[in-house]
Swiss-Prot record:
Specifically inhibited by spautin-1 (specific and potent autophagy inhibitor-1), a derivative of MBCQ that binds to usp13 and inhibits deubiquitinase activity. It comes from the Eukaryota. A zinc finger (UBP-type) spans 168-276. Deubiquitinase that mediates deubiquitination of target proteins and is involved in various processes such as autophagy and endoplasmic reticulum-associated degradation (ERAD). Keywords: Autophagy, Hydrolase, Metal-binding, Protease, Repeat, Thiol protease, Ubl conjugation pathway, Zinc, Zinc-finger. Residues 317-844 form the USP domain. Zn(2+) binds at residues 192, 195, 212, 225. The active site is at 806 (proton acceptor). The lineage of its organism: Eukaryota, Metazoa, Chordata, Craniata, Vertebrata. GO terms for biological process: autophagy; cell population proliferation; protein K63-linked deubiquitination; protein stabilization; proteolysis; regulation of autophagy; regulation of DNA-templated transcription. The keyword Zinc applies. One of its GO terms (molecular function) is zinc ion binding. CDD domains: Peptidase_C19B (cd02658), UBA2_UBP13 (cd14387). This is Ubiquitin carboxyl-terminal hydrolase 13.
Length: 846
């Protein structure tokens, strides 16, 4: 028999591999579905690629690759048979254990046991070889099988990729001298004390000075003033502002010339009024000081105490919590309740799977289709077995109905390369939503882009207070952020009385009084959104100098789906993250037509489109800037010998472009730095005229919109060595967003197809107020229409900070509200409309 098996496997020996240290073995989950060894059909692991496939998908992999040898893993769950001592049998595979296969946490391990079975299966005849079979199998096959069975989870390798290099404790930390000069650092509004830069800022831990970093530090430019200050004063340690969290911060030692650990960081920051001690978390991941005062919020959001009826079937599938992953699960539940996302991924599931790359675990569309099908098929959301069948089933083999799906593979792909999302910490759902939209757009080139439904244009009107002249610009956005004006609370007297009782209870060490929450009218939030905003350090092109400025924002277009974020999270003066505990009467029906932008009004005079002079510093890293500005190409051997202002005919967008060029090309291996004599707001992506910055000429913006990149922008990108056609294609494919265009060019091979096609970027969908669009357009579209909406989704947060707590979402389906709380899905009795964090509205007809 041994010779027969050896001869049988001879043709397949070249395709059987032993996993190496860098290989990922997916033996717990199918690449295309949520099948696992516990599924009825078990899981097939390819012995060449080590990818896992359910019974419905293994044939596709065989046909596509010709790979014939798979290891079939099957886990049986049975009632525990106890021995004389009452102990449990271990999980086993014919006398051996499956390693690194987690137990089903939904099964009580005191009542059930696991029996694991493995065998080799040869396709297409499905010839089976039971394992282990050391005597009859060739040595190489035995070694390969052992390596697969003993392999660790691939997600442990993914977690290791996000680990940072181990840092050492600074030799200056224990005896750091701090000057008692009365300096207290506010939680925002920082500037370099020497050049007014507002990014890449470092706080010196000795004297509290705030100065900018060196060139290319933390992905952005600086003038090196923090290092100069150290050379002058000798103060050794600095912390990067914006990196401070409860777990620490980025600390740099100038003397040791490396990033270091400061074990006394909380003490050193407290010297300057930054209190981190109150931010320390407890073992359960919830801040210690948030539990008692927030109990009421947790109960209301999760509808605790109410008899909620479980929901099952298509669209009512829960998602298991991986540990602080509720920010992701709530967003994805809402996303796949939207028809456009359902059609784009689940509707095209067969095509997406058939054309998936050889490693579908790393393909965005495949994993989106997999998740969408898992949530919408109902396969993983089945009601419990009927009571009369339970006894019969338990006598044979228990087959537990799956409760929710495990999104570990999906999360690993979504968070790849992102420090925060790849961690196990709780995150901001709003930040993940924007991160997700960015991934959708990057992976929708040449295909349907379902994120079009969220995109809208914002018109920003900025007025110089001295000259009274104005500038109208437009930018793309996906979220309407509403401020919370606490001063408009309608129950101020109750709040004052509650605060007094709370203080008395604390001093007397009594239980706190019943919580009183500030009641803020939604109309007040909407009014605050429309209020003029002061623009600090506004550079007026009319005055050719800094001046006071004010900015107002309006909608240049209304999206198909409106996402509204309530800006609840902020920092107190003590640097402790705070969540505004408010109740807002969010409407079920919302009409924002009165917020439609009007464009330049009669009698208004526009500011000249001129930017301040650009200063090229005395730095060898400025060679690329010289080549760009001189138009001499990228191969320049000389450098500027002295810093000098260049009065170039650049508008503000070109100045902003240069800064983005500096940021972006660094990660692709270039060195490029430009110092601007004016600070420009880089918080928003650079959107170049075209789809991204359309100038409306009427209330409905009925001007011709063409996604044609400006020639000067194309020329600047070409000067980096990119072919013109490639630059045009990238800009059109990314809505003229330079940051994404550069990333697109490095991740997509040059393609000449469609490079010279010009198409529109607005889809009105039979809207008489919109603009006719070319159906073959490449760039993202603006789906304009009326501004009347109906609420259909709510993401709520329980806790005091986005760094902790828990997210729950409520979605309106089939006329009723449903609560999605991790793997639990139930009919909602009291959706917490007044306590939500992110609200989702869909457009309704007038």
């Amino acid at each position: 028999m041994a010779e027969d098996l050896g001869e049988l496997l001879v043709p397949y020996m070249p395709t059987i591999r032993v996993p190496k240290s860098g290989d990922r073995v997916y033996k717990t989950e199918c690449a295309f579905s949520y099948d696992s060894p516990e599924s009825d059909g078990g899981l097939y692991v390819c012995m060449s690629t080590f990818l896992g496939f359910g019974r419905e998908h293994v044939e596709r992999h065989y046909r596509k690759t010709g790979q014939s040898v798979y290891m079939h893993l099957k886990r049986h769950i049975r009632l525990k048979a106890t021995g004389a001592s009452g102990g449990a049998f271990p999980k086993r595979i014919n006398g051996r254990l499956f390693l690194d296969l987690e137990n089903n946490t939904e099964m009580n391990t005191e009542d059930y046991e696991y029996e694991d079975e493995a065998k080799l299966v040869i396709f297409p005849d499905h010839f089976e070889i039971a394992l282990p079979n050391i005597e009859e199998l060739p040595a190489l096959v035995t070694i390969a099988c052992d390596a697969v069975l003993n392999s660790k989870s691939p997600y442990r390798k993914l977690d290791q990729e996000s680990w940072e290099e181990e840092l050492q404790v600074s030799k200056f930390a224990n005896n750091l001298v701090q000057i008692d000069n009365g300096v207290k650092i506010p939680p925002s509004g920082w500037k370099c004390s020497k050049c007014d830069l507002q990014e890449n800022l470092w706080l010196n831990l000795t004297d509290g000075s705030i100065m900018c970093g060196r060139w290319f530090c933390s992905g952005s430019g600086g003038n090196g003033h923090a290092l100069e200050h150290h050379k002058q004063m000798g103060y050794p340690l600095a912390v990067r502002l914006g990196s401070i969290t409860p777990d620490g911060a980025d600390v740099y030692s100038f003397d040791e010339e490396e990033a270091v650990i400061d074990p006394h960081l909380a003490k050193h920051l407290a010297h300057f009024g930054i209190d981190m001690l109150q931010m320390q978390g407890s073992e359960n991941g919830v801040l210690d000081n948030e539990v008692k005062p927030r109990v009421n919020e947790w109960e209301v959001i999760q509808e605790t105490g109410l008899k909620l009826k479980p929901m099952f079937g298509s669209g009512y599938t829960g998602i298991k919590n991986l540990g602080n992953s509720s920010y992701l699960t709530t967003v994805m539940q809402v996303i796949f309740s939207i028809p456009e996302f359902q059609r784009a991924y689940v509707g095209n599931l067969t095509r997406i799977f058939d054309y998936a790359p050889l490693d579908p675990t790393q393909d965005f569309s495949t994993q989106m289709a997999k998740l969408g099908h898992g949530l919408l098929s109902g396969q993983f959301s089945k009601p419990p077995m009927k009571s009369e069948l339970i006894e019969q089933v338990m006598k044979e083999e228990h087959k537990p109905q799956p409760k929710g799906i495990n999104t570990r593979m999906f999360k690993a792909l979504m968070s790849k390369g992102h420090t925060e999302f790849s961690s196990n910490r709780q995150q901001d759902a709003e930040e993940f939503f924007l991160h997700f939209i960015n991934l959708v757009e990057r992976n929708s080139i040449g295909a349907e882009n379902p994120s079009d439904v969220f995109r809208f244009l914002v018109e920003e009107r900025t007025q110089c207070c001295q000259s009274r002249k104005v500038r109208y610009t437009e930018r793309v956005d996906y979220i309407m952020q509403l401020p919370v004006p606490m001063e408009t609370a309608t129950n101020k007297e109750e709040l004052i009385a509650y605060d007094l009782k709370r203080r008395e209870a604390e001093s007397a060490k009594r239980p706190p009084p019943e919580l009183v929450r500030a009641k803020i009218p939604f109309s007040a939030c909407l009014q605050a959104f429309t209020e003029p905003e002061n623009v600090p350090d506004f550079w007026s092109s009319a005055l050719q100098a800094k001046s006071a400025g004010v900015k107002t924002s309006r909608f240049a277009s209304f999206p198909e789906y409106l996402v509204v974020q309530i800006k609840k999270f902020t920092f107190g003066l003590d640097w402790v993250p705070k969540k505004l505990d408010v109740s807002i009467d969010m409407p079920d029906l919302l009409d924002i037509n009165h917020l439609r932008a009007t464009g330049l009004k009669s009698g208004e005079e526009e500011l000249p489109d001129i930017a301040p002079p650009i200063i090229i510093p005395d730095d060898p890293n400025g060679r690329m800037a010289e080549s760009l500005l001189s138009g001499s190409g990228s191969n320049v051997n000389s450098s500027f010998k002295g810093a000098q202002p260049l009065n170039l005919p650049f508008g503000k967008k070109e100045a902003k472009l240069l800064r983005y060029m500096e940021r972006m090309v660094e990660k692709f291996g270039f060195k490029f730095s430009v110092r601007l004599s004016v600070e420009i707001d880089f918080a928003e992506p650079l959107i170049i005229p075209g789809c991204g910055t359309v100038t409306s000429t009427s209330s409905h913006g009925q001007n011709a919109l063409l996604n044609q990149p400006p020639e000067e922008i194309v020329a600047l990108i070409c000067s980096m060595g990119f072919p013109r056609n490639h630059a045009l294609q990238a800009l059109r494919a990314t809505n003229n967003n330079l940051e994404r265009a550069l990333d697109w060019m490095f991740s997509h091979p040059e393609s000449e197809e469609g490079a010279d096609n010009v198409s529109g970027c607005v889809d009105t969908e039979n809207n008489p107020n919109g603009i006719i669009t070319d159906s073959e357009q490449e760039g993202p579209r603006i789906k304009d229409g009326n501004g009347r909406y109906e609420l259909f989704g709510i993401i709520s947060h329980a806790g005091t900070s986005t760094m902790s707590g828990h997210y729950v979402c409520h979605i309106k389906k089939e006329g009723r509200w449903v609560i999605y709380n991790d793997h639990k899905v139930s009919a909602s009795e009291r959706p917490p409309k007044e306590l939500g964090y992110i609200y989702f509205y869909h457009r309704i007809s007038c």
